[in-house]
């Protein structure tokens, strides 16, 4: 309030409900299985880089086009550099996407009812109307309902694959069928933050569907959540629009050191493949053991599982485990309150959690 008792905040800000991130506690040491961080350190090549990096480079502005990093990403996916955009984490990229492609003048944005909870925040921020489409009883996406949108036009569609927080993935055929039926003048955004843990990527479809944009991140599979680096793949038209959006906010979004670390990370394919395989093995081990203890475990292609046990609330599970020094994610949302989301750590982490769950519940 100012001296006259008037609010100094915009009406837009006063109407916002911000995203609530997962806990990053400092009060004690926890086994952190709540924010889908990779349990392994990044590629050792990155440690070597940091030891040798010349800090004098940091007095210079970074390449605003991130050309070298984009070239390396393009080579990895066998696409052109004009198909690649990079930003400070996929969250920033998704914010640009919402601004660049979704306009309430053409209808509501469509996304699943239970999904990444930043989506409605972006909609409120940019004043984009939206429709949440309920999941099917088995927690899979109802693609038919997403396409139909209640018989109304939509300004676009967005969903994670695998979905979060369920971990359930669509097949490539399902995605192709959706794209074949959806209006070609409306952008479809597939958020592939967790695709490397067993899902089928839609990146190979961007040359056939000019309205498809795929968002990826270095946070999960590359163990670089603390770096804040993401990228998107799509048609040159979509990528140009993202650059226009970025340059209207901040031309120099991705720092020099961040770009260099990204280049090194994406080239260490041996490290990447080994760590992904170990996480998948730990996930499958944990899932089967937990089912044996009477838990429902949704089929996951991510680095987490969404689970519940009959007779228990998600809040009870979360609070009891926290007292024991283990953090999982609980969503106080109607329809999924009995579930918790468990990040997959190292196999020994999951074995410890299994023992605690068996003893406590």
Curated annotation (Swiss-Prot):
Named cofactor requirement(s): pyridoxal 5'-phosphate
Highest taxon of the lineage: Bacteria
Pfam families: Aminotran_1_2
Signal peptide: none
EC number: 2.6.1.9
Keywords, alphabetical: Amino-acid biosynthesis, Aminotransferase, Histidine biosynthesis, Pyridoxal phosphate, Transferase
Leading EC class: transferase
GO molecular function: histidinol-phosphate transaminase activity; pyridoxal phosphate binding
Disulfide-bonded cysteines: none
Reactions accelerated catalytically: L-histidinol phosphate + 2-oxoglutarate = 3-(imidazol-4-yl)-2-oxopropyl phosphate + L-glutamate
Gene3D superfamilies xrefs: Aspartate Aminotransferase, domain 1, Type I PLP-dependent aspartate aminotransferase-like (Major domain)
Pathway annotation: Amino-acid biosynthesis; L-histidine biosynthesis; L-histidine from 5-phospho-alpha-D-ribose 1-diphosphate: step 7/9
Modified-residue entries (N6-(pyridoxal phosphate)lysine), positions: 220
One example of a Gene Ontology biological process annotation: L-histidine biosynthetic process
Quaternary structure note: Homodimer.
Family in the record: Belongs to the class-II pyridoxal-phosphate-dependent aminotransferase family. Histidinol-phosphate aminotransferase subfamily.
Protein known as: Histidinol-phosphate aminotransferase
Provenance organism: Syntrophus aciditrophicus (strain SB)
Organism ancestry: Bacteria, Pseudomonadati, Thermodesulfobacteriota, Syntrophia, Syntrophales
């Amino acid at each position: 309030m100012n001296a006259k008792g008037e609010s100094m905040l915009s009406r837009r800000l006063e109407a916002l409900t911000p995203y609530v991130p997962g806990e990053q506690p400092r009060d004690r040491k926890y086994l952190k299985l709540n924010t889908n961080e990779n349990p392994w350190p990044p590629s050792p090549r990155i440690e070597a880089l940091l030891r040798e990096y010349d800090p004098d480079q940091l007095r210079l502005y970074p390449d605003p086009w991130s050309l070298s990093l984009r070239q390396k990403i393009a080579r990895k996916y066998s696409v052109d550099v004009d198909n690649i955009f990079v930003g400070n984490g996929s969250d920033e990229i998704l914010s640009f996407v919402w601004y660049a492609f979704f306009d309430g003048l053409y209808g509501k944005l469509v996304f699943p009812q239970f999904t990444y909870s930043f989506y409605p925040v972006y909609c409120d921020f940019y004043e984009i109307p939206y429709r949440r489409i309920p999941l099917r009883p088995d927690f899979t996406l109802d693609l038919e309902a997403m396409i139909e949108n209640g018989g109304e036009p939509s300004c676009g569609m967005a969903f994670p694959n695998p979905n979060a927080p369920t971990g359930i993935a669509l097949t490539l055929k399902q995605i192709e069928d959706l794209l074949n039926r959806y209006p070609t003048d409306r952008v479809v955004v597939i958020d592939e933050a967790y695709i490397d843990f067993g899902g089928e990527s839609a990146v190979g479809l961007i040359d056939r569907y000019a309205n498809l944009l795929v968002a990826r991140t270095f946070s999960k599979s590359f163990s670089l959540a603390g770096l804040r680096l993401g990228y998107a793949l799509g048609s040159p038209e979509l990528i140009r629009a993202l650059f226009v959006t970025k340059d209207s906010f901040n031309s120099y979004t991705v720092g020099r050191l961040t770009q260099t670390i990204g280049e090194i990370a994406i080239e260490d394919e041996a490290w990447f493949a080994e760590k992904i395989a170990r996480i998948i093995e730990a996930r499958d081990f944990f899932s089967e053991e937990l089912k044996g203890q009477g838990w429902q475990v949704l089929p996951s292609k991510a680095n987490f599982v969404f689970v519940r046990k009959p007779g228990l609330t998600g809040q009870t599970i979360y609070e009891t485990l926290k007292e024991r020094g283990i953090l999982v994610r609980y969503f106080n949302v109607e329809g999924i309150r009995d579930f918790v989301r468990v990040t997959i750590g190292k196999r020994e982490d999951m074995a410890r959690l299994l023992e605690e769950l068996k003893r406590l519940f």
